[in-house]
Amino acid sequence: EAGDDKAILLMMKWGYEGSKAFIGGNPVKKIINSSREIIEILSVDLKACNNYKSGKESLEKINCPTLCIFGDLDKMVPLKVGNKMSELIKNSETKVITDCGHMIIFEKAFEMRKIVKEFILKLKK
């Protein structure tokens, strides 16, 4: 649709806000070759997100230990929104990764892995 290319490029820029040229100091060197590779998938995803209306109710139903990890530079799920989300989840823990956008697993893979490992080990105690 009109403006899709620009929207995708902005999402890619915002998603990887904490990294330079989509490189996060981890094994993943290049994530995407062109906006055309994802335009159809992204369109479907955005429509699904836009049509989803029961997020709050769904979050309130979660009762198992939950780890919420956010990037402090994320523009797609700003920290303020992420914190509101995690507050709705009973028994949740929130971690924030600095200098990181929306694509945490690619931008800060090692830091994220460490946080997840610590969370899992704590659950085993």
Outline where the language-model segments fall.
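Generic recognition of short, well-ordered alpha-helical segments
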Residues: 57, 80-84, 107-110
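Conserved alpha/beta-hydrolase catalytic His-Asp/Glu region
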Residues: 2-61
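Short alpha-helix in the alpha/beta-hydrolase fold that links the catalytic acid
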Residues: 64, 78-87
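A short, basic/aromatic alpha-helical/loop segment that forms part
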Residues: 52-53, 75-76, 103-107
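Short beta-strand/loop motif that positions the catalytic acidic residue
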Residues: 62, 68-70, 74
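Catalytic active-site module of serine/aspartate enzymes centered on a nucleophile-bearing elbow/loop
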Residues: 92-125
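Conserved catalytic core of Hanks-type protein kinase domains
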Residues: 61, 88, 106
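Structural signature of beta-strand start/N-cap positions in the alpha/beta core
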Residues: 58, 65-67, 90-93
